[in-house]
Amino acid sequence: MQRRGAGQMMIGAGDDGIEVLLGVLTLREVVSLIERTARWVAPETFRLLPVWFPEHARRGLFYKGNWSEPQMNKSRATGHSVHKTEGNTHANQALTLALGLRKKRRANWSCCHIWGIDDASYQLSNAVVQDHRFFSCVGNMVLLPTPLKAFTDTMPSVKKMLRICARNLYGWQCDHDDLAAPNELLEKWDTWDAYPESWPRALDEKRPPGVVELSPAIRAEAEKRPACIRNDLANAGPFYPREKVRAALDYWKIEL
């Protein structure tokens, strides 16, 4: 789309917001904002511990008392109690720890899943992040300034470029069955004029800006998790999802 000056822009009721945006900024300029601000987990951290909380996945149910009884939320408006479910809590926690951060020092940053069901309308069930193998996988996430997350959620070209960067950085591409068609399209990507120069186009070619190197503190956090998982497998209550946890560990070849 040809770019228009601010004085020329006429916004009608039927105008698509993304088209209007791309009339002011090029796709390259949009992606440049992400290029210069994103925070990536180091490949060494990913290899050390690919998935941090395999007991959790999007829409999973929360339990208290060491997985022995349901954790409920009570509505102030209706007084009704409902079973509390996972939104993005443990994905956020995994990414925060893998970047050596603390939640309270992460104001206005958002966890963005790289591989998932592409649905700008937010109407489809996201089977990828409902999979225990991929929800808290640190190679499936990037930390972005919160306003920029909307670009990744609503602009397929931006999400594709993130996926190309991630698979070349980590040497891994999500192989969930529901991603077979999107992954095939990714192989045909040819919009390199908008792809950031600082991002890798091939495996191990380069690292994007914003990679947080594996530090002793990050390593220490990663090395705590296998012992916790091992203890939960042995001792957690009846609602602990043992089969799904073991399947995730087997997929990633994690030995406890």
Regions found by a protein language model. Name each.
Residues 111-112, 137, 165, 174, ...:
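Generic recognition of cysteine residues
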